[in-house]
Amino acid sequence: MAGNDWINSYLEAILDAGGAAGEISAAAGGGGDGAAATGEKRDKSSLMLRERGRFSPARYFVEEVISGFDETDLYKTWVRTAAMRSPQERNTRLENMSWRIWNLARKKKQIEGEEASRLAKQRLEREKARRYAAADMSEDLSEGEKGENINESSSTHDESTRGRMPRIGSTDAIEAWASQHKDKKLYIVLISIHGLIRGENMELGRDSDTGGQVKYVVELARALGSTPGVYRVDLLTRQISAPDVDWSYGEPTEMLSPRNSENFGHDMGESSGAYIVRIPFGPRDKYIPKEHLWPHIQEFVDGALVHIMQMSKVLGEQVGSGQLVWPVVIHGHYADAGDSAALLSGALNVPMIFTGHSLGRDKLEQLLKQGRQTRDEINTIYKIMRRIEAEELCLDASEIIITSTRQEIEQQWGLYDGFDLTMARKLRARIKRGVSCYGRYMPRMIAVPPGMEFSHIVPHDVDQDGEEANEDGSGSTDPPIWADIMRFFSNPRKPMILALARPDPKKNITTLVKAFGEHRELRNLANLTLIMGNRDVIDEMSSTNSAVLTSILKLIDKYDLYGQVAYPKHHKQSEVPDIYRLAARTKGVFINCAFIEPFGLTLIEAAAYGLPMVATRNGGPVDIHRVLDNGILVDPHNQNEIAEALYKLVSDKQLWAQCRQNGLKNIHQFSWPEHCKNYLSRVGTLKPRHPRWQKSDDATEVSEADSPGDSLRDVHDISLNLKLSLDSEKSSTKENSVRRNLEDAVQKLSRGVSANRKTESVENMEATTGNKWPSLRRRKHIVVIAIDSVQDANLVEIIKNIFVASSNERLSGSVGFVLSTSRAISEVHSLLTSGGIEATDFDAFICNSGSDLCYPSSNSEDMLSPAELPFMIDLDYHTQIEYRWGGEGLRKTLICWAAEKSEGGQVVLVEDEECSSTYCISFRVKNAEAVPPVKELRKTMRIQALRCHVLYSHDGSKLNVIPVLASRSQALRYLYIRWGVELSNMTVVVGESGDTDYEGLLGGVHKTIILKGSFNAVPNQVHAARSYSLQDVISFDKPGITSIEGYGPDNLKSALQQFGILKDNV
């Protein structure tokens, strides 16, 4: 009954604290069936104690009871209280409270059981899929190669453990490396879209979005911009013009001045250097947290694309001999920027790098282990599933993933479907040996620690009494921040224990204060300084931060630490070095005891000023300590261990001096010059990618093959080898069809290259051949018809009504039309023919869910025979989307998967050979109830390292598998890049629902018209199911979206007039 005695004590404490009923419900996210109706209020209150809006003793005691005692003890307590049957209000409340806590404990146990079952099932699925992938790849693996794989894995582990290239150990080495790369003119794009980002006076710690990542990306951009070989660096972020933030965050561009131009000086051009470029997207007058940015990501991508295109032209004139200078790499930071970088990388066909900073799956696992919230509750608060899907997309699209530590690779990225360390090593070994990977790809994981600027740091020598030794023996004026800190202390000369972190629960500052307060010897020997961001009024801080700060103040009062703890309200970013100097002058210690620290940049900063460290052993500090060897690692949950480590360092002068010396000796392994060298060395290993129609050789000679005319004239000759013959393909097998298509393509391409080689402008081609595709450049507006949720007859009628509504503009040529569909081009042709619509009524056709882009052709010479279709395919578009396309290896896996699904005797999926193309593998769904939702199919492909975009179409009756970065929305961006069709001048017409890529058609800077009415098909649950809600990714209240009932010409005309596409009737 000892357990029950503790429970009784806690229950009495809860009653004394008051508000028990509400606190109990909040402590575990509610209880009983009625709790489900509380909606968002319950979700917000169900945050764990250290992340809630206000400190509550009742919540604390409830959580202690639920987490610390067995369900049986709780049941016995309830039985005892129920048996008392006392009419007193207190006993009645005690009985009710005991029952509710008992049920909450049962709920917690149930959640834990469900999560354990889910994880076990997930492990089995991964093992099965990866065994299949390993067996598939081992078919042609020789015994010698199998043996070599072991050595490869070992060497890879050693390389990743080191986490960096050999460091630049001297100024001579730096200068030698600089001279080797000075002739390069690289353009690098970095992306970090949340938080408040500016080059000077950064408001670090103002909120949870403005922390270490902000400082890292700014300093990385600054350092890269000063590195030889780099001409320009753009750090793209969000433009914020909100009244509650400084005006500087609304400036479109901010130049980052180099910290040290001596070592990294190079010839500066007109647009060279590093810049913060702020792209307007989302609410113009609001500063919103990162969880609310997801619906606006595509708008950012479109704005960033415009900037990059403009800058590429400018740099082409300055350093590219007139040719566009594309970014050598696009580097996303955190999941939201990674999602943006993936789309930009796909649109521009340039390599992508990703740095996670913190990862969604790791956070989800930690929250689920606590058992206080369900998966749905966590997702509602943090939009965690949308974040995880973005991180999975980053694995699909990135060539390199940069991490700070080895732990992040093994323990955090290992949680993702798209990454497996063992398979990554095998694939890399096969690539080195030239062995087929069967369409499988894995990004390269590289541990590269963040850098730091040391040029302005001059650690002072400290004598045995703790006084600074000046060369002239005279003192110097103390910085003002010293007085702001020392006014808190009754004895300011005692060694200072310094913690610098925002008041966030995961920073674990409350445990530090407890450790300090309960260790009498430490209190007598040292002072504690807590630099916890900036604040004016505690009640005006965010709820989470104010709760933590209130807890700290109460602990200071509890342990009577007045005169021993400093917690200044304000400090400037420029004063942080002075704070480090003060701690070093007093022979103090720097501490970071966060529960998990992804890297720990402040530990490096402190070491640079001669401060030993005490740091958490969870995460990046482990790697930092391995290099610097300047302190002690501790368990952040063990306050006694924290206190003993601090006491040991401040009390042992020899140990303190040795740790200080080690840190200063090794600190330059974390310098920005070395970081940039390692970074650019990795970038240099990437295969250059850029749009293929750009001429890559000497610009003084204009080659016909590089002109837009020849690019599409060769397309005429190949003329859509998607089996344009309508009557010969059905009888052939897939293998023979593909072989014949390839042979025909080679022959016709050869004829096109060798015959009639003459320079011809786009305009001349239009005049001589009658082709309409160049007209895209001259359209003022483009109407994109992308309606998936209607029958063919309704779609034909909608097209005709749109033509009628815009008849005047059609005749004048100011408005053009694009049909965007999941159909193959042969199906499009049949649809148009059935409705009496000419192909030339459209400027372009986006087919096969965005894997093919075609243009109409009215010239009979363009067609290979009368049976072939009047379309031309854009081969340049294929070069844009072919990145990581698995081809025949992917097709083989899909066929096996479809066969496995049909093992029960009933056919579930059948390959649709007619509608498949080189970059689209199409299936017909025979049994919609037996096929998994898209998220499960994507998961299956990712586990096997197959990178593709899987989507259901035609109300779930068809399945298309296309390249991972191909989509109908990406095809619209290609039209902008290739032909200059402004995205803001496009209007996309959609239904109320659509294919599983529907969300991509709604976001962005283009206008959107949604057709509502009973003619829309009811979404099929198979393809409508997603891991996150549509509202998490689409903002339906943005100005560019409107809805109309039906699809009559008058309603359509009114909507088009609303967006300024049509002129009002005079």
Curated annotation (Swiss-Prot):
Family, as annotated: Belongs to the glycosyltransferase 1 family.
UniProt protein name: Probable sucrose-phosphate synthase 4
Keyword Repeat: no
Keywords: Glycosyltransferase, Transferase
Gene Ontology MF terms: sucrose-phosphate synthase activity
Species whose genome carries this gene: Oryza sativa subsp. japonica
Keyword Glycosyltransferase: yes
Function: Plays a role in photosynthetic sucrose synthesis by catalyzing the rate-limiting step of sucrose biosynthesis from UDP-glucose and fructose- 6-phosphate. Involved in the regulation of carbon partitioning in the leaves of plants. May regulate the synthesis of sucrose and therefore play a major role as a limiting factor in the export of photoassimilates out of the leaf. Plays a role for sucrose availability that is essential for plant growth and fiber elongation.
Comp. bias intervals (Basic and acidic residues): 143-162
Annotated metabolic or biological route of this protein: Glycan biosynthesis; sucrose biosynthesis; sucrose from D-fructose 6-phosphate and UDP-alpha-D-glucose: step 1/2
Triggers of expression: Circadian-regulated, with the highest expression 1 hour after the beginning of dark period (in 14 hours light/10 hours dark cycle).
Tissue specificity comment: Expressed in germinating seeds.
Gene Ontology BP terms: sucrose biosynthetic process
Enzyme class: transferase
UniProt xrefs under PANTHER family: SUCROSE-PHOSPHATE SYNTHASE 1 (PTHR46039:SF2), SUCROSE-PHOSPHATE SYNTHASE 3-RELATED (PTHR46039)
E.C. code: 2.4.1.14
SUPFAM superfamilies on file: UDP-Glycosyltransferase/glycogen phosphorylase (SSF53756)
Subunit structure: Homodimer or homotetramer.
Catalysed reactions, semicolon-separated: beta-D-fructose 6-phosphate + UDP-alpha-D-glucose = sucrose 6(F)-phosphate + UDP + H(+)
Annotated control of activity: Activity is regulated by phosphorylation and moderated by concentration of metabolites and light.
